[in-house]
């Protein structure tokens, strides 16, 4: 069974179409109109080995907030839909990823309970056209709409591009590990409650 989903979101601010294949090979086709966000989603998918296609048209004449947020809402929804009942999942995983002088850490639990904590300090207001104040909100959008517990932290670093890149790579690697099927579970839901 292919674990994939297509999400479309149309609002008065944005028009987003996103396709995710969890069991992919890292193929990407991404155009959001925000170059740095495209770059982060590209390396997220490559490090997670997810196939990811994104097309977004938004009110970038206002700012990048609505477009970036709605893309990450759709990404979270795609994970939630593609995972279905989440039977047989490893469920929890974490990853440390260095990017030159920066070190990022992400831990996830595909528990069905959305919660997000981001501990990251940035020194510049934006990287490219993406405001650094949005990074925590983007991770929160993925967590809430993906119904997952997500903790992200920049342990240290100087360059804001490197810090954000370490976090997105770590998120891809953590989700790759957490979404794997553990054959020892025999297809049951990975919870003592029997449901997620």
UniProtKB/Swiss-Prot annotation:
Coiled coil: none annotated. It catalyses: D-erythro-1-(imidazol-4-yl)glycerol 3-phosphate = 3-(imidazol-4-yl)-2-oxopropyl phosphate + H2O. Keywords: Amino-acid biosynthesis, Cytoplasm, Histidine biosynthesis, Lyase. Pathway: Amino-acid biosynthesis; L-histidine biosynthesis; L-histidine from 5-phospho-alpha-D-ribose 1-diphosphate: step 6/9. InterPro entries: IGPD_sf, ImidazoleglycerolP_deHydtase, ImidazoleglycerP_deHydtase_CS, Ribosomal_Su5_D2-typ_SF. It is an enzyme of class 4 (lyase). It is found in: Cytoplasm. Transmembrane segments: none annotated. It comes from the Bacteria. Its EC number is 4.2.1.19. One of its GO terms (cellular component) is cytoplasm. Belongs to the imidazoleglycerol-phosphate dehydratase family. This is Imidazoleglycerol-phosphate dehydratase. The lineage of its organism: Bacteria, Bacillati, Chloroflexota, Chloroflexia, Chloroflexales. The gene is hisB.
């Amino acid at each position: 069974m292919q674990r994939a989903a297509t999400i479309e979101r149309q609002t008065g601010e944005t028009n987003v179409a996103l396709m995710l294949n969890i069991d992919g090979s890292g193929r990407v086709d991404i155009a959001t109109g925000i170059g740095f966000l495209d770059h982060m989603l590209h390396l997220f998918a490559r490090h997670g080995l997810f196939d990811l296609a994104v097309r977004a048209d938004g009110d970038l004449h206002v700012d990048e907030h609505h477009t970036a947020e709605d893309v990450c809402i759709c990404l979270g929804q795609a994970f939630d839909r593609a995972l279905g009942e989440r039977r047989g999942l490893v469920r929890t995983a974490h990853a440390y990823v260095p990017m030159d002088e920066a070190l990022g850490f992400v831990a996830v639990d595909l528990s069905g309970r959305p919660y997000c904590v981001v501990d990251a300090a940035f020194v510049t207001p934006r990287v490219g056209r993406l405001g650094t104040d949005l990074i925590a909100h983007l991770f929160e959008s993925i967590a809430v709409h993906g119904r997952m517990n997500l903790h992200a932290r920049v342990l240290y670093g100087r360059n804001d591009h490197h810090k954000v890149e370490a976090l997105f790579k770590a998120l891809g690697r953590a989700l790759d590990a957490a979404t794997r099927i553990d054959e020892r579970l025999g297809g049951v839901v990975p919870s003592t409650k029997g449901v997620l």
